[in-house]
């Protein structure tokens, strides 16, 4: 089967069409702007899969309808998923703009005095607003000389933010969410909303009963040689934590081996269902070898699977990580309990950063007073105002231990193409695999247990659906916190100590939901959240605006908020603008 190509970025150099002196004097400068933009994007960006980003430049500068149509024909044939229009001069507004209604688009008008690039920018944006096709404005803060070919830092920041978000939009379009199972324990996010995926994300939902997973395991619809490799890898790398079950529920060595084997098989089969596996065609399973074209998935597990079979904790943790028995590789996006809305937040974070995502329960707010009462320890530093305990048995990527290192030697999570095998091994070494608690998981299983290193910047996100309003996005930037070991142990043992933990301190603003840490917890819209490495809330805001998903809660600096120019016409308060604009324009892929 032909491999689906990755979306490309289209660069549209537009120009004043008046011949006999005007156009001719601008051709080189305009095309050089396009080439410089393409060079910046290809140098600084990668797809989430690690592949290089490609830019497609119009064959000619665009002065009017004919050249705009020729450019569109070229872009359509090369899978261009977003466009950036560039110009140093006046051009003919509505005659030269990108009219595709679902393709993210930005316009960079050069800030110079010799030619009015800013005037074209304003005219073109007015046309976009009047036609109901929002576009992003890029205009440098400082005037440049006409022969200055550099890209100013503020322009570069907007170009990259737009491109990252636009590539995420284009990469999700046409893919599917694999809903493996149904509703888990009444969790609303696992009531998978097909209309949300179709209308806002341009995706389909592939609903598959969990019996399909059982069939693949029982009928050996998998690569048996790979299973042996996976078992050998686990034997070499897994450290096992204590079994906290009562004696009558503890498994012997043979039973434990069977649980491990099935857990690894679940990872293999879920992966194969998502992306396909040509090895299955070799054993006569051609249909199954194709997969479901899934860019994200969720596994119900509880309770209709886990009351009888091993839980999904091991499978989900391995799939979400940037490595397995095949070495370092692209992480998958798999939501525990089939929480599709948390899965979408994971997908957004992965597409924007290329990194693995940490799925967690937003479990407990610990005030400084409560911690001092229980442990005798007085919180300070990043944790001085209190912390949130993020913990879940399921699909927290092992990268979340933060045993990888950045260029300064600080703990972090990196995109897989920057991760060394030594760093992957360090994440495994920091993880214990604890037998599942029988009262919750009667079929057994293993939960990963690690503790996230402190001082690491994170962005916590969540998508919720509100009846009558639609999807909304929550964002909380903050840091992981490291507690003294005895303090961590006391707090952790008050809950399920066999699960991975991140102690999270959101950045406070003193206003609204970020008045204090308690308010962050109290305003969180569901029981789950996602941690994405870095303070990348601004990228999430830009992406959400492209999809027409309003942001109901964030602590990103106002100067970093970047949305289409038309949002400014929807009122004077920028968050109210967001709601009104999203309601006005409706879902990106209206249905």
UniProtKB/Swiss-Prot annotation:
Gene3D superfamilies: 3.40.50.1070, L-fucose Isomerase, Chain A, domain 2, L-fucose/L-arabinose isomerase, C-terminal. It is found in: Cytoplasm. Disulfide bonds: none annotated. Its EC number is 5.3.1.25. Mn(2+) binds at residues 337, 361, 528. Its main location: cytoplasm. This is L-fucose isomerase. It comes from Escherichia coli O1:K1 / APEC.
